[in-house]
Amino acid sequence: MNLPGLITIRPDQHDLLAKAAQIIGDSFIEEPWSAVWVSALDKFGADTARKQEILRASLLDELTAHARYQGAYLLEDETAAFGGYLYSELEGRTHTDLDANAPGFLDAILTPDERKALTEQAAAMERISQFDWTRVRENEGDHIYLYSWAVDKNARGKGSLRRMVEPIFAYADEHNLNCYLECYSDHLQSMYEHFGFEIVDVLSDPAFDITERRMVRRPNA
């Protein structure tokens, strides 16, 4: 998608991808799913800085993999970023396919013990980690999936989020497309409902205190 006010990051724009990964990764230290995932490193004494480094690398993998298919974006003033794609632009690939073929930035910085702990934690969280469901719900029809977004911490309260999401929703409305995302907190659910999203379903696992709220925004919501 080419969206006004947003930079569609190319795979060779490494500085912009790193900037987007920093914005989202640093914000995701507060995001419930990510916080639970990296809590697996607490037994190694991992501090916030180490967890942020890992989240940045994880996001850099995901953004770089999706940038090949117009799936990574920055506001032109670089105060907010999002990962998301128009399903038809994946050219038959899936979100899972792209994540499985990421460049390996995360793997390069992990110790063997960290890698094992995070892999085991992700497997344990599988029931509340369903991130490739929208294409099934849409019966392979076109739609927009937003897999991550965030505002730079230093730019919060300045309207960056609204300036980022308005072009996405305008495109969705113009082309009669559903938009999808997931969230894991009441606060985020309320914010997304303010933008016109509604709950599709909620996934839970008794082993974890968080729930996955899968949400849709219908055209002209």
Model-predicted segments: where are they?
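Helix-loop element at the rim of GNAT/NAT acetyltransferase active sites that forms part
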Residues: Q22-A49
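Conserved acetyl-CoA-binding loop-helix of GNAT-fold acetyltransferases
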Residues: S148-V151, G157-A170
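A short helix-loop-beta-strand connector motif used in the catalytic cores of GNAT acetyltransferases and
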Residues: T48-L74, G141, Y145
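Conserved acyl-donor/pantetheine-binding loop and adjacent beta-alpha core of acyl/acetyltransferases
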Residues: A81-A150, R156
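Conserved GNAT acetyl-CoA-binding A-motif
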Residues: H143-I144, Y171-Y184
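Glycine-rich acetyl-CoA-binding "A-motif" of GNAT/NAT acetyltransferases
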Residues: E78-A81, H187
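Conserved N-terminal entry element of GNAT/NAT acetyltransferase domains
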Residues: M1-A18, Q22, D26
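Conserved active-site alpha-helix within GNAT-family acetyltransferase domains
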Residues: E174-H175, S185-L203, F208
